[in-house]
Amino acid sequence: MSSLFITATGTNVGKTHTTLKLLDALAAKGRSVGVFKPIETGVLDSAPDATILLESCRKVNRNFEGLKTEDITAYTFPLPAAPFCADTNHKIRIDRILEKYHQLSQLCDILLVEGAGGLMVPVTRDFFMIDLIKELQTRVLLVTPGRLGCINDTLLSMEALKSRNIAFDWCINLYEDAESFTEVTQPFYDAVFPAWWSDKEGMEKFARSL
């Protein structure tokens, strides 16, 4: 079993969108795909991200047909905030997240793990999302936006991953400012990262590499 952790430069950048596209691309190649959303905040009645992930996964993996959203999440909280802030009772246990991860790993040959927020989002007081990635020992797909200011956020995220020797790939989700991207961002990416790719082009090729 292999796994891939989908993270981003921040919140509302497109982790769920990218995870769903990758799920479809992998399933189209005959892979048995699973999904895991360790922590979701801003949950009142049902976890929106986990729900849509599970609905899509059920269509391509029978092992997930009988599961509920709480089966593919470890913790949910009503407050839309970083896990440490949303967890007002401080009940998050990393070993519970790892246990869920290993349980779901038995149901697929590749598990897509969607993070919350960005790499330095606090899960507990001294444990961050990037630390969870290290614990899981998984490869990473970093999702970045194309809007003005994203170069700085992208480079900082890359530096964080490199400093911890975490292998990663990255893609651009051109959902914002797609028209201005060619002027305000693309020139730098073309000069420094000529092999960059977006979620609209290159997802199938990336899926073949997993």
Swiss-Prot record:
Primary subcellular site in the record, as a coarse category: cytoplasm
Superkingdom classification of source: Bacteria
EC top class, as a word: ligase
This protein's encoding gene: bioD
Tagged with keyword NAD: no
Alphabetical list of PANTHER family matching this protein: DETHIOBIOTIN SYNTHETASE
EC number: 6.3.3.3
Positions with a binding annotation for substrate: 41
Pfam families: AAA_26
Protein known as: ATP-dependent dethiobiotin synthetase BioD
Binding-site residues, Mg(2+): 16, 114
